[in-house]
Design a protein with these regions (language model features):
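N-terminal periplasmic accessory domains that precede
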Residues: 13-16, 28, 44-47, 59, ...
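Structural signature of outer-membrane beta-barrel domains
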Residues: 22, 34, 82, 103-105, ...
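Short acidic/polar hinge/loop motifs at secondary-structure boundaries
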Residues: 34-63
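Extracellular loop and loop/strand-boundary signature of outer-membrane beta-barrel proteins
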Residues: 41, 99-100, 155-160
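Outer-membrane beta-barrel pore domains and translocons
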Residues: 62, 80, 99-105, 118, ...
């Protein structure tokens, strides 16, 4: 209740909790506090993890427990990425998944790839995504057609300039477990 998102870039959105957003909300990914990736806050901290690599999201509206970092007036978003896969007993795991999509408005194409190779003690996981999108089109002409500000391309009257983007996220997870202990390295 009271949680929404403001889409301010093609790469991610900014969480809004009870009308507060941006630096008024604490965002933790795998235990690390993150802030916007650029000075004008176009890419929120959520742009540093792909949605296909999320295992759990917890949202705290308003006051946040000290165990989750406290220090936020709007609330907190706590994200945990996928944990490594391990095989049962002496089996081996070989899992691979590819998904893709395409949108016609801005000719956006995206691919997600995940791969896991594991025994019952060691695990290697890769999760990657890449998206490439052109400028999107408005419902009708809203301006005169002209050259872009850089003079390198022509922008139609229904085209929203500077809305094109490319984005990629990659995560490699190495895991080792023995008895009740897990060592996890994420790059």
């Amino acid at each position: 209740t009271g949680v929404n998102s403001a889409i301010n870039s093609g790469a991610s959105s900014m969480p809004v909790i009870r009308g507060l957003s941006d630096d008024r909300i604490k965002i933790k990914i795998d235990g690390m506090d993150l802030i916007s990736a650029c000075a004008n806050h176009m890419n929120s901290p959520l742009s540093s993890i792909d949605s296909s690599n999320i295992q759990q999201i917890k949202v705290f509206a308003g006051l946040t427990p000290v165990s989750m970092g406290g220090d936020s007036i709007g609330g907190s978003v706590v994200i945990n990425s996928m944990q490594p896969d391990f095989a049962k007993s002496d089996e081996k795991i070989f899992k691979h998944k590819i998904s893709t999509f395409y949108t016609t408005n801005n000719k956006a194409s995206r691919v997600n790839i995940s791969s896991s190779i594991a025994s019952n003690k060691l695990s290697f996981n890769y999760n990657g995504s890449y998206i490439d999108a052109k400028n999107f089109k408005a419902g009708k002409h809203f301006k005169d057609s002209r050259l872009s500000a850089t003079g390198r391309q022509f922008i139609d009257g229904d085209e929203v300039g500077s809305s094109a983007f490319k984005d990629g996220n990659h995560m490699i997870t190495l895991g080792s477990r023995k008895d009740n202990q897990l060592i996890n390295i994420k790059l």
